[in-house]
Amino acid sequence: MSRKPADVASKERNEYIPSFIAKKPFYIDDESTANDYLEHQRLQKQATDQSKWYDRGKRAGPAATKYRKGACENCGAMTHKSKECLSRPRKLGAKWTGKDIQADEVVQNVELGWDAKRDRWNGYDPSEYRQVIEEYEELEKLKRNTKPGAQDGKKIMDGELDDEEAAIEEARYAEESDMGRQQSTATRNLRIREDTAKYLLNLDLDSAKYDPKTRRMVDMGAQDDQAAALVAEENFVRASGDAAEFERAQRYAWESQERGDKKIHLQANPTSGEILRKKEQAETEAKRQAQRKALLEKYGGEEYLKPTPLRETMVIENERFVEYDESGAIKGAPKNAVKSKYPEDVLVNNHTTVFGSWWHNFQWGYACCFSTVKNSYCTGEDGKKAFEEAEMRSMGLLPGPETSDQTSPPAKGETNDIHEAEDLSDRSQRKADTETNTRKRTMMEMKSGVSEEELESYKRSRLAADDPMASFIGKE
């Protein structure tokens, strides 16, 4: 008896669905049992295609024959604007020429799931990594050919060596490249320390005082021997003597071994390494001198490469301590007179002094002739006498030139009258000066203030117009 195949509803029994819904009605044919009428209540499991990605550069069908409105002005495609166009910018775009109109790109709607959105390798083409593999194989081939056993390396690449020879060759290659798997992780990560510890510089028990807790030398270790000269300060060893030369030799050995030219070991055979290094230095220097000579012969200019004789007199570095002040000058140095930007001590027009050497009545002038006119001709002592006479005439002490020309020279009897007139004018001048001085307030009076007598006299002498209430007097 053959069993009836179970339908979809009987596979998953749900106790929360009533029986009148779960059971098949009598009017339902058996042929339709394959169709689950409760499919809308089932959990829909849609398998998303995680490998779905954009088809880059795919075009949709043939290109248009003429420009369409709204298309790219550069290439004529409808799927992007002109500022988003990735084609070469044309001098005249497809909008104006109507030629070489590109086909439209395929705009795809890629809907990815939760996992596909976070897949970092989604859309990656594995064929792109083939270029990296080929480059690596080419480098490996070049490395093996540059080694001393180039023929063995060629046999390994061709697969002609047996397993034992291949293992020996691989071990040698791994030892030279320092990348072998037979080395442990600790061995590969260990840094080779070839510097000497400070507590081993001097093995005298009384000199080196090393504190293991703080890992430092007390009193910088030995102070009187050669070992202490190498110690400059904490955790620093001064490079002195042949230290720099040793470092260059060590670097040359390492670089030569990396290039695969020679297998130089500085500690095992230092003599050969030194000879090869000096030989290479001599060859390099000879090439440089030959190139320099060829350039000088071709272009010239050897006279400009000679040392200048004034180079020895230039300021060189010294240990003399110099202290500067706030203005930037050397502190304690004698101050030089500040020079003006204008020309100084330039004597013109027979003057013996410069303009501005004499001051009178708020005017600058020449001290040699008392002239206040700039760039005037010097008159010397005559000019001074003329200036004094003009001053006396302005003060009224001497008669004017018109009066002296009109009157005749005074007689002997009139000389006394002239002297009396001069005495009278002197007395009047002194009297005027005395009155002026009495009107001026002295410094003591200004400091002491206004006295009561002065205030009373001021109030009496003040005009009535200054009083604002004076206008109301007599109006009532």
Curated annotation (Swiss-Prot):
Zinc fingers (CCHC-type) by residue: 70-87
Molecular function terms from GO: pre-mRNA 3'-splice site binding; zinc ion binding
Cited Pfam families: Slu7
Compositional bias annotation for Basic and acidic residues: 414-444, 456-465
Keywords from the named record: Metal-binding, mRNA processing, mRNA splicing, Nucleus, Spliceosome, Zinc, Zinc-finger
Similarity comment: family membership: Belongs to the SLU7 family.
Record's subunit section: Associated with the spliceosome.
Protein's name according to its UniProt entry: Pre-mRNA-splicing factor slu7
Gene: slu7
